[in-house]
Swiss-Prot record:
It is found in: Cytoplasm; Nucleus. The active site is at residue 57. It holds the Pfam family dCMP_cyt_deam_1. It catalyses: cytosine + H2O + H(+) = uracil + NH4(+). This is Cytosine deaminase. Substrate binds at residues 44, 147. Pathway: Pyrimidine metabolism; UMP biosynthesis via salvage pathway; uracil from cytosine: step 1/1. One of its GO terms (biological process) is cytosine metabolic process. PANTHER family: CYTOSINE DEAMINASE, CYTOSINE DEAMINASE FAMILY MEMBER. CDD domains: nucleoside_deaminase (cd01285). Its EC number is 3.5.4.1. Gene3D superfamilies: Cytidine Deaminase, domain 2. Homodimer.
Length: 150
C-alpha cells in the first residue's frame, strides 16, 4: 500500500462514515488524479435522496462534475467496497485504469470484469471498512438487499 492509497481510501472511508451518520448505506468513494488532486468524492445516497443509482462511485462521479472523459484515464477511483455491476460499468466507460477498494468480504462485485478489461484492481482488506459495512448489513438488512438488487 502506498501513501496515495492510504490517503485515497481514507477520503472514501470518511464519506462512508458520513453516509452512515445520515442513516444511509456506508459506502464511500473518491476520484484522485495522479497529482493527488481529489476530483470528486461522494457516498451512497440511495436512502437519503431516494435514488436508484447514487452508489458511492456514482456519487463521486456526479460530484466531480462534467469533465472530459480522458481526465479519468489518469485517475484512481477509491471505494470502500468492491464495485457492483453498475459502478463497474461506469469505471469501464470512463476508462479508469486503477481501482482501489477497502474490502470485498461483505460483497464481491465485478472485480473479474475490471481485470479482464485491463483495470488494475487493488484490495486493501481494510478492517475498518469491513466492520462498518458488516455493522450496517446486520442493522438494516432490508436496505442492504435493496441496494444490491435483491
Amino acid at each position: 500500500m502506498t501513501f496515495d492509497d492510504k490517503k485515497g481510501l481514507q477520503v472514501a472511508l470518511d464519506q462512508a462514515k458520513k453516509s452512515y451518520s445520515e442513516g444511509g448505506i456506508p459506502i464511500g468513494s473518491c476520484i484522485i488524479s495522479s497529482d493527488d488532486t481529489v476530483l470528486g468524492q461522494g457516498h451512497n445516497e440511495r436512502i437519503q435522496k431516494h435514488s436508484a443509482i447514487l452508489h458511492g462511485e456514482m456519487s463521486a462521479l456526479e460530484n466531480a462534475g462534467r469533465l472530459p472523459g480522458k481526465t479519468y484515464k489518469d485517475c484512481t477511483i477509491y471505494t470502500t467496497l468492491s464495485p457492483c455491476s453498475m459502478c463497474t460499468g461506469a469505471i469501464l466507460l470512463y476508462g479508469f485504469k486503477r481501482v482501489v477498494m477497502g474490502e470485498n468480504v461483505n460483497f464481491l462485485g465485478n472485480e473479474k470484469l475490471l481485470i479482464e478489461n485491463g483495470v488494475e484492481v487493488v484490495n486493501l482488506n481494510d478492517q475498518e471498512c469491513i466492520d462498518l459495512m458488516a455493522k450496517f448489513i446486520k442493522e438494516k438488512p432490508q436496505d442492504w438487499n435493496e441496494d444490491i438488487g435483491e
